[in-house]
């Protein structure tokens, strides 16, 4: 995968890391998932959304965004085509006031904390929902970037963002402890592919382990950058998505999701151990 600016609609798209589908498309909306572990883990995901895309209606705000079908000129048979693409990156709550995301999300734009907010429960109730309403209590401003390290060539691409107030209505993600990451470990990805409302994608596993990251066959897309990658059995946070293969393939006048076989997985996940020591010291 390569880094790519989508300039069709917005000036900045921090998810500049396109990805793809491996085997069957396993992306699901939260309402369509029955696994209680996955539903609970989805509460830790947050969407980084530009303030200009928010319409305050009192105690809640409406996020409309651009329909996915217009953003990428999708073919009529493509999934989620009517849902809004509003997010610019994904993030995962790793402390009561700290979000972990990809460092490149904070490398592509200035004044991030001034122009963007982090939104929890950015999700739909049915597949063709064209806008999303979220309680203002679940919209958080950031105060500062407390850690940012990026060297894509060696698999380093992570940042920790401090929020202005603590998140008190949900638990943060449990980081993998002493257990060593193993090949074929089952994984689930939770975030905002193509800027969409929260999607859960499982039925993936670890293909290769590198020094600072690992390679998987997760069904991921641009703007999944920073999405939490969890162990599908224990629920532990294994890392965050950084990069992968190209996600869309042109077919004449429209585009479709690009599909690969499972063994061709090339989605890079930054290992959560790179931030564990910093977090433990910071929270003291």
Where are these regions (language model features)?
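N-terminal signal peptide
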Residues: 14-16
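Catalytic nucleophile loop of clan PA
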Residues: 92-93, 220-242
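C-terminal cap/linker of serine protease catalytic domains
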Residues: 124-125, 132, 137-141, 168, ...
């Amino acid at each position: 995968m390569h880094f790519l600016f989508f300039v069709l609609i917005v000036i900045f798209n921090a998810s500049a890391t396109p990805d793809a589908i491996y085997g069957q498309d396993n992306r699901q909306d939260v309402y369509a998932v029955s696994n209680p572990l996955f539903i609970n883990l989805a509460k830790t995901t947050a969407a980084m959304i530009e303030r200009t895309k928010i319409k305050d209606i009192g105690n809640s705000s409406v996020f409309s965004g651009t329909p996915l079908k217009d953003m990428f000129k999708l073919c009529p048979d493509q999934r989620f085509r009517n849902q809004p693409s509003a997010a610019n990156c994904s993030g995962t709550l790793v402390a009561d006031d700290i979000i972990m995301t990809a460092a490149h999300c904070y490398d592509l734009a200035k004044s991030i904390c001034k122009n963007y907010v982090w939104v929890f429960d950015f999700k739909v109730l049915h597949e063709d929902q064209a806008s999303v309403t979220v309680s203002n209590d679940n919209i958080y401003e950031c105060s500062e970037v407390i850690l940012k390290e990026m060297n894509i060539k060696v698999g380093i691409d992570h940042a920790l963002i401090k929020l202005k107030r603590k998140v008190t209505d949900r638990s943060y993600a449990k980081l993998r402890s002493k257990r060593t990451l193993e090949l074929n470990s089952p994984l689930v990805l939770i975030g905002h592919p193509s800027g969409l409302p929260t999607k859960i994608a499982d039925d993936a596993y670890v293909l290769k382990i590198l020094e600072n990251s690992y390679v998987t066959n997760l069904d991921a897309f641009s703007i999944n950058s920073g999405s939490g990658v969890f162990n599908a059995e224990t629920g532990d946070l294994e890392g965050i998505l950084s990069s992968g293969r190209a996600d869309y393939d042109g077919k004449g006048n429209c585009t479709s999701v690009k599909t690969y076989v499972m063994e061709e997985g090339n989605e890079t996940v930054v290992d959560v151990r790179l931030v564990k020591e910093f977090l433990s010291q910071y929270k003291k």
